[in-house]
Amino acid sequence: MIIYKKNVNYLLIDGTSYLYRAYYAFLKFKNNFNKPCGAIYGMLNMLRSMLLKYPYSNIVVIFDSPQKTFRNELFIPYKKNRPKMPNDLKEQILPIHHIIKHIGIPIISIPHVEADDIIGTLATKLYKKKYFILISTNDKDLAQLVNIHIHVLIGTSNIVLDESKVKKKYGIIPKLIPDLLGLMGDNSDNIPGVPTVGKKTALILLKTFGSLENIYNNIEKIPKCLIKKAKTIYNNLHTYKKLAFLSQKLATIKTDINVNITTKKIKMLPPCTTEISNFFLHYKFYNWNKLLKQGLWLKNCK
């Protein structure tokens, strides 16, 4: 089923993925006190776009926890390849949370839990109640959650991935994305995968055997498969079996974290226009403040 704008009950925004994009897109933005505010501007610009595009939806923004998660305990090098958050981005996080809340949009961030796992759990709870959910993200991993009730919006584009589009884009059905990453790894998250197994080989193996588990159940058949360096692939799968399943686990988004998130807690609230206006003036967002005074900036807020 295609989810159209009018029947998207919940729009779950992967705030962390937008935070970095906004920061680098507006790196030179500063306020009256010469403090950086590009990430603030970029996040607000994105949120306003979403409010305009999805006026009938309840929007929720989800952020990563700064603390380590279970994945860091499973695999110490997990995401170790990423640079530390710049200090001038850190300074903008609290103001971003502040203004989002005053707009009336709920924020969820849970200690020691990644945004992906919060989104996975929340989306699963909501679709079991027959709601339609759209996840807005720049992260390909979240495509594994796609089903008849959950679709993924790529960034601020109009590209929405349903089950058929996920298969077309990645070559496999949504639920097999962790298996794919278990084999080929994921450089962006420092997930190792199996050495010498690239995307093309991983897709052939998954299409032939159906899942990572079935690949290992039929591993003796691999030398006879019509793939390049089949013997090497066979040997590496044998040698790095634990690494393959560890990588799959690292790439699998949790849908059952123990957290009490009710629909009441994620309901949008009326915006506080006085606080928003003061915020806009503080950060020199004068055009936005003018639109706010005219009732145009928040015209689609509940």
UniProtKB/Swiss-Prot annotation:
SUPFAM superfamilies attached to this UniProt entry: 5' to 3' exonuclease, C-terminal subdomain, PIN domain-like
Q: Which GO terms describe its biological process?
A: DNA replication, Okazaki fragment processing
The 5'-3' exonuclease domain covers 173-269
Q: List the Gene3D superfamilies hit by this protein, alphabetically.
A: 5' to 3' exonuclease, C-terminal subdomain, 5'-nuclease
EC class of this enzyme?
hydrolase
One Pfam annotation reads 5_3_exonuc_N
Gene Ontology MF: a single term: 5'-flap endonuclease activity
Q: Does the keyword DNA-binding apply?
A: yes
The name on file for this protein is: 5'-3' exonuclease
**What organism is listed for this UniProt entry?**
Buchnera aphidicola subsp. Baizongia pistaciae (strain Bp)
